[in-house]
């Protein structure tokens, strides 16, 4: 746990209309995230909340008016954890995400949870009560040393163990291979590791912008100097050939192994055992919602 400044704040509503490509509502029971991921795009939230502290060192715990009519969200998609992790370590004490799920019981909305934690296992009893629920874990490496350099979340093995348990409980799971670090993330290795207990594998490339670009580029230069020219080409000279070639390689790999493959799609449903659907999100702005598989 890396958050040093924790405060409780009152908000009118925890439900926010989403501008994300996945649509629906974006719900974040916390402001900030103690995982302190070095590449996290959500660090931009600082400028809207008055925080000047380093990302990962603060956490606002939201208190909201109770959701009394969960049917208001019927037919919607509710994404929990778009700019925080609802199952960050402090959730074990504050229980805001569990409270949210309790208040949403009865809705037929599609619940989508994004996490890097295994604390979600605590709420399996609640998750089973929703007709449509998906839990996704971010996994962009099988190398625990690289993982530890990038975030303060639980180990990859704990994430995968949780994914397997949720899958076996009958809940749809996603392995979110994000962000893909050029020359470092081994996409096929991750797919082969998780294929028996996940329905979808989302693939998203590393985007470097804002303050964390300098940090990541410095890290690559110091820890992976042989990769630095590649990062220079992609992120300073805006060359796209690496991603274009990787896209072709993934498509060929999917065809060879008979994995369904989609581009910028958000299919719903369970996959065949050991045949997860691979979804390429290299171009988020063109995502098509709910297209049939």
Predicted regions and their residues:
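Conserved strand-turn element in the central/C-terminal portion of the radical SAM core barrel
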Residues: 164-185, 236-240
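Generic structural signal for well-ordered alpha-helices
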Residues: 64-65, 98-101, 124, 159-163, ...
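Surface-exposed amphipathic alpha-helices with a cationic face
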Residues: 105, 128, 160-170, 251-257
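Conserved Radical SAM active-site core
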Residues: 1-134, 142-146, 156-157, 168
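Active-site beta-loop-alpha junctions enriched in small/polar residues
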Residues: 83-85, 116-118, 138-142, 178-180, ...
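Hydrophobic faces of well-ordered beta-strands that scaffold small-molecule active sites
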Residues: 25, 78, 111, 135-137, ...
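Surface-exposed cleft-lining segments at the edges of enzyme active sites
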Residues: 86-88, 144-152, 172-178, 237
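Auxiliary Fe-S-binding modules of radical SAM enzymes
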Residues: 2-10, 188-293
